[in-house]
From Swiss-Prot:
Belongs to the calcitonin family. PANTHER family: CALCITONIN, CALCITONIN-RELATED. This is Calcitonin receptor-stimulating peptide 2. Its main location: secreted. One of its GO terms (molecular function) is calcitonin receptor binding. Keywords: Disulfide bond, Receptor, Secreted, Signal. One of its GO terms (biological process) is adenylate cyclase-activating G protein-coupled receptor signaling pathway. Disulfide bonds join 83-88. It comes from Canis lupus familiaris.
Length: 127
């Protein structure tokens, strides 16, 4: 597993050293004898190789993150499903009821609360 974390950086490092000329071996024949066997990569080949390495690294990190979320999600569902005793169920129902009450108050209650709002007439007391 540790190798896969290091492999993108290793590949990029090798590519950089290769382009810098550090990893090129001494040729047995002159480069002028056979121009088709060039030891350098073109700009397009470098871009394609670098893009592939970065894409592989991003996919690897996405898989690791997804696995972490799945393991966290499974532990949370196990904790939620273990709530079968009386106080736990009561607390859960109380939370649902409080959320429903807030929703009803926010959507159905008028903001101008006075006697006329509900159809009642305010009668002044005659002295």
């Amino acid at each position: 597993m540790g190798f896969w974390k290091l492999s993108p950086f290793l590949a990029i490092g090798l590519l950089v050293m290769y382009q810098a000329g550090i990893l090129q071996a001494a040729p047995f024949r002159s480069a002028l004898e056979n121009p088709l066997e060039s030891a350098t990569l073109t700009e397009d080949e470098i871009c394609v190789l670098l893009t592939a390495v970065v894409k592989d690294y991003v996919q690897m990190k996405a898989r690791e993150l997804q696995q972490e979320q799945e393991t966290e999600g499974s532990s949370l569902t196990a904790q939620k499903s273990s709530c079968k005793d009386g106080p736990c169920v009561t607390n859960r129902l109380e939370g649902w009821l409080a959320r429903a009450e807030r929703m009803v108050k926010n959507t159905f209650m008028p903001t101008d609360v006075d006697p006329e709002a509900f159809g009642h007439q305010h009668k002044e007391l005659a002295a």
